[in-house]
Protein backbone atom coordinates (compact mmCIF):
# COMPACT_ATOMS: atom_id res chain seq x y z
CA UNK A 1 0.00 0.00 0.00
CA UNK A 2 1.18 3.47 -0.79
CA UNK A 3 -0.17 6.95 -0.20
CA UNK A 4 0.43 9.16 -3.23
CA UNK A 5 0.65 12.93 -2.88
CA UNK A 6 1.32 15.72 -5.33
CA UNK A 7 4.98 16.36 -4.65
CA UNK A 8 6.43 17.63 -7.89
CA UNK A 9 6.86 21.37 -8.15
CA UNK A 10 4.81 21.59 -11.35
CA UNK A 11 1.85 19.76 -9.80
CA UNK A 12 1.93 22.01 -6.72
CA UNK A 13 2.05 25.14 -8.91
CA UNK A 14 -0.80 23.82 -11.09
CA UNK A 15 -2.92 23.00 -8.02
CA UNK A 16 -2.38 26.45 -6.52
CA UNK A 17 -3.30 28.18 -9.79
CA UNK A 18 -6.42 26.05 -10.24
CA UNK A 19 -7.49 26.19 -6.60
CA UNK A 20 -7.36 22.38 -6.45
CA UNK A 21 -6.54 20.20 -3.50
CA UNK A 22 -6.45 16.47 -3.98
CA UNK A 23 -5.34 13.26 -2.39
CA UNK A 24 -5.11 9.70 -3.65
CA UNK A 25 -4.55 6.31 -2.11
CA UNK A 26 -3.49 3.44 -4.35
CA UNK A 27 -3.13 -0.30 -3.76
CA UNK A 28 -1.87 -2.98 -6.16
CA UNK A 29 -3.34 -6.31 -4.93
CA UNK A 30 -1.59 -8.17 -7.76
CA UNK A 31 0.37 -7.33 -10.94
CA UNK A 32 -2.80 -7.01 -13.07
CA UNK A 33 -5.05 -4.98 -10.74
CA UNK A 34 -4.88 -1.56 -9.16
CA UNK A 35 -7.41 -0.12 -6.72
CA UNK A 36 -7.64 3.44 -5.51
CA UNK A 37 -9.56 6.07 -3.61
CA UNK A 38 -9.35 9.79 -4.27
CA UNK A 39 -10.66 13.09 -2.99
CA UNK A 40 -10.63 16.39 -4.88
CA UNK A 41 -11.63 19.87 -3.77
CA UNK A 42 -11.92 22.63 -6.37
CA UNK A 43 -12.33 26.35 -5.72
CA UNK A 44 -14.25 27.74 -8.70
CA UNK A 45 -13.99 31.48 -9.33
CA UNK A 46 -15.91 33.32 -12.06
CA UNK A 47 -14.52 36.83 -12.64
CA UNK A 48 -17.63 38.24 -14.30
CA UNK A 49 -20.19 36.26 -12.24
CA UNK A 50 -19.10 36.13 -8.59
CA UNK A 51 -22.50 34.71 -7.56
CA UNK A 52 -21.39 31.47 -9.27
CA UNK A 53 -18.17 31.18 -7.23
CA UNK A 54 -18.30 27.74 -5.62
CA UNK A 55 -16.53 24.86 -3.97
CA UNK A 56 -16.72 21.48 -5.72
CA UNK A 57 -15.88 18.33 -3.75
CA UNK A 58 -15.57 14.89 -5.39
CA UNK A 59 -14.83 11.48 -3.85
CA UNK A 60 -14.21 8.44 -6.02
CA UNK A 61 -13.01 4.88 -6.36
CA UNK A 62 -10.79 3.55 -9.14
CA UNK A 63 -10.13 0.09 -10.48
CA UNK A 64 -7.74 -0.71 -13.33
CA UNK A 65 -7.38 -4.25 -14.66
CA UNK A 66 -4.76 -5.35 -17.20
CA UNK A 67 -6.34 -7.95 -19.46
CA UNK A 68 -4.38 -11.03 -20.50
CA UNK A 69 -3.41 -11.28 -24.14
CA UNK A 70 -1.89 -9.06 -26.80
CA UNK A 71 -2.15 -5.28 -26.95
CA UNK A 72 -1.47 -4.41 -23.30
CA UNK A 73 -5.21 -3.80 -22.88
CA UNK A 74 -6.32 -2.10 -19.66
CA UNK A 75 -9.93 -1.75 -18.43
CA UNK A 76 -10.67 1.16 -16.07
CA UNK A 77 -13.74 1.82 -13.89
CA UNK A 78 -14.33 4.90 -11.73
CA UNK A 79 -17.54 5.52 -9.75
CA UNK A 80 -17.62 8.92 -8.02
CA UNK A 81 -19.89 11.35 -6.22
CA UNK A 82 -19.81 14.79 -4.71
CA UNK A 83 -21.38 18.20 -4.57
CA UNK A 84 -20.90 21.74 -5.75
CA UNK A 85 -21.89 24.47 -3.29
CA UNK A 86 -21.89 28.17 -4.15
CA UNK A 87 -20.22 30.54 -1.71
CA UNK A 88 -23.42 32.60 -1.71
CA UNK A 89 -26.59 30.93 -0.41
CA UNK A 90 -28.19 30.14 -3.80
CA UNK A 91 -29.97 26.74 -3.85
CA UNK A 92 -30.40 26.97 -7.65
CA UNK A 93 -26.59 26.67 -8.03
CA UNK A 94 -26.16 24.07 -5.27
CA UNK A 95 -26.15 20.48 -6.55
CA UNK A 96 -25.13 16.92 -5.81
CA UNK A 97 -23.48 14.79 -8.46
CA UNK A 98 -22.85 11.10 -9.05
CA UNK A 99 -21.17 9.42 -11.98
CA UNK A 100 -19.40 6.48 -13.51
CA UNK A 101 -16.48 6.43 -15.94
CA UNK A 102 -15.52 3.31 -17.91
CA UNK A 103 -12.51 3.14 -20.17
CA UNK A 104 -10.42 0.84 -22.27
CA UNK A 105 -6.83 1.46 -23.41
CA UNK A 106 -4.94 -0.69 -25.91
CA UNK A 107 -1.78 -0.64 -28.01
CA UNK A 108 -2.71 -0.16 -31.67
CA UNK A 109 0.71 -0.67 -33.24
CA UNK A 110 3.29 1.66 -34.81
CA UNK A 111 3.62 3.52 -31.48
CA UNK A 112 -0.08 4.41 -31.17
CA UNK A 113 -2.14 3.67 -28.04
CA UNK A 114 -5.92 3.92 -28.38
CA UNK A 115 -8.51 4.68 -25.75
CA UNK A 116 -12.27 4.45 -25.55
CA UNK A 117 -14.30 5.99 -22.76
CA UNK A 118 -17.87 6.32 -21.57
CA UNK A 119 -18.90 8.65 -18.77
CA UNK A 120 -22.32 9.10 -17.21
CA UNK A 121 -22.99 11.85 -14.67
CA UNK A 122 -26.18 12.90 -12.91
CA UNK A 123 -26.57 16.31 -11.25
CA UNK A 124 -29.51 17.18 -8.98
CA UNK A 125 -29.88 20.83 -8.04
CA UNK A 126 -31.35 21.72 -4.65
CA UNK A 127 -33.49 24.71 -5.50
CA UNK A 128 -35.80 25.88 -8.28
CA UNK A 129 -34.52 28.02 -11.11
CA UNK A 130 -35.97 31.52 -10.61
CA UNK A 131 -36.72 31.96 -14.34
CA UNK A 132 -38.35 28.55 -14.98
CA UNK A 133 -39.74 27.80 -11.50
CA UNK A 134 -38.48 24.20 -11.69
CA UNK A 135 -35.59 22.30 -10.15
CA UNK A 136 -32.85 21.44 -12.61
CA UNK A 137 -31.85 17.79 -13.02
CA UNK A 138 -29.16 16.83 -15.57
CA UNK A 139 -28.16 13.40 -16.87
CA UNK A 140 -25.05 13.66 -19.04
CA UNK A 141 -23.45 11.00 -21.23
CA UNK A 142 -19.98 11.47 -22.76
CA UNK A 143 -18.49 9.13 -25.37
CA UNK A 144 -14.79 9.51 -26.11
CA UNK A 145 -12.58 7.91 -28.75
CA UNK A 146 -8.92 8.86 -28.71
CA UNK A 147 -5.33 7.88 -29.19
CA UNK A 148 -1.87 8.98 -28.16
CA UNK A 149 1.37 8.91 -30.08
CA UNK A 150 4.89 9.83 -28.89
CA UNK A 151 6.37 12.59 -31.04
CA UNK A 152 9.45 12.99 -28.84
CA UNK A 153 11.09 11.41 -25.79
CA UNK A 154 8.55 13.00 -23.41
CA UNK A 155 6.14 14.59 -25.85
CA UNK A 156 2.79 13.03 -26.85
CA UNK A 157 0.08 14.09 -29.26
CA UNK A 158 -3.50 13.12 -28.31
CA UNK A 159 -6.29 13.43 -30.89
CA UNK A 160 -9.76 12.77 -29.41
CA UNK A 161 -13.35 12.73 -30.62
CA UNK A 162 -15.83 13.55 -27.84
CA UNK A 163 -19.63 13.42 -28.06
CA UNK A 164 -21.71 14.80 -25.19
CA UNK A 165 -25.45 14.44 -24.66
CA UNK A 166 -26.91 16.30 -21.69
CA UNK A 167 -30.54 15.53 -20.86
CA UNK A 168 -31.86 18.34 -18.64
CA UNK A 169 -35.20 19.32 -17.16
CA UNK A 170 -34.53 22.92 -18.23
CA UNK A 171 -34.42 23.46 -22.01
CA UNK A 172 -31.38 25.81 -22.13
CA UNK A 173 -29.28 23.09 -20.48
CA UNK A 174 -30.49 20.26 -22.75
CA UNK A 175 -27.92 19.85 -25.54
CA UNK A 176 -25.78 17.68 -27.81
CA UNK A 177 -22.19 18.57 -28.64
CA UNK A 178 -19.45 16.85 -30.66
CA UNK A 179 -15.85 18.04 -30.40
CA UNK A 180 -12.61 17.11 -32.09
CA UNK A 181 -9.76 17.83 -29.68
CA UNK A 182 -6.02 17.59 -30.21
CA UNK A 183 -3.65 18.23 -27.36
CA UNK A 184 0.06 17.92 -26.88
CA UNK A 185 1.41 16.68 -23.55
CA UNK A 186 4.86 16.95 -22.09
CA UNK A 187 5.51 14.31 -19.44
CA UNK A 188 8.00 15.39 -16.78
Name every feature range the model reports, one short phrase each:
Residues 1-188:
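Gram-negative and organellar
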